[in-house]
Structure formats: C-alpha cells, structure tokens
C-alpha cells in the first residue's frame, strides 16, 4: 500500500519536471536546451524593410536620392520660388503686373 502512495505522489512530480523542461533526456541533454535549439532553427530570418524616407517611386528610383539631386540642382531654393518667378515673368511680359508692386 505504501508503494502505491509513493508512486501516486512521485509520478505527477516527475511529469511536471519533464513538462517544464527541468528534467533530462536519455543522453543527459536538458529538455530546455533541445527546445531552444529547435526554436532558433525554426525562427524565420527578419525581413529587411526600407524606411519611409528611402521609399522608391513608380520607376523604382530612390526618392531621397532624387530629392537631394533636385535640391542641389535648384541651389536649395524651394520649388514655389521657381514657379512663382516664372508666373511673375509671364505676367510682366503680358503687362498685367504693376511694376511698382512687383519689382
């Protein structure tokens, strides 16, 4: 009768240790080591993603590089200056602008 009582108490403890990975396997390797090796082997490699600043346009060209080239070409002037100067020049040629207000 005492043997059954010990087995009744011992079997759940051994099972609990094996489930938690604190027990050892046949050849002395711990369950946790085996699990961690398998987990890292199955882990997918991270996908390298481009940041939003390095996104590409429809032609597959890098937008940041293109913007740097455009700004260098413009001399770091905003786009509105070019468009505004063209508009003023056209209006001046047509005689629609007052020369005192727009020198």
Swiss-Prot record:
One GO MF term: toxin activity
Region (Disordered): 34-83
Signal peptide residues on this chain, from the entry's feature table: 1-21
Residues with PTM 4-carboxyglutamate: 82-83, 89
Protein localization: Secreted
Main location: secreted
Cofactor(s) demanded: Ca(2+); Mg(2+)
Start-end of Basic and acidic residues biased regions: 55-65
Keywords on record: Gamma-carboxyglutamic acid, Ion channel impairing toxin, Ionotropic glutamate receptor inhibitor, Neurotoxin, Postsynaptic neurotoxin, Secreted, Signal, Toxin
Cofactor note: Divalent cations stabilize the toxin the in alpha-helix conformation.
One GO CC annotation: host cell postsynaptic membrane
Propeptide feature: residues: 22-79
Keyword NAD: no
Tissue: Expressed by the venom duct.
Similarity-based family: Belongs to the conotoxin B superfamily.
Function: Conantokins inhibit N-methyl-D-aspartate (NMDA) receptors. This toxin has the highest potency for the NR2B/GRIN2B subunit (IC(50)=0.11 uM), followed by NR2D/GRIN2D (IC(50)=0.48 uM), NR2A/GRIN2A (IC(50)=2.1 uM), and NR2C/GRIN2C (IC(50)=6.1 uM) subunits when tested on rat receptors.
Additional observations: The mature peptide does not contain cysteine residue.
Record's protein name: Conantokin R1-A
Organism listed in the record: Conus rolani
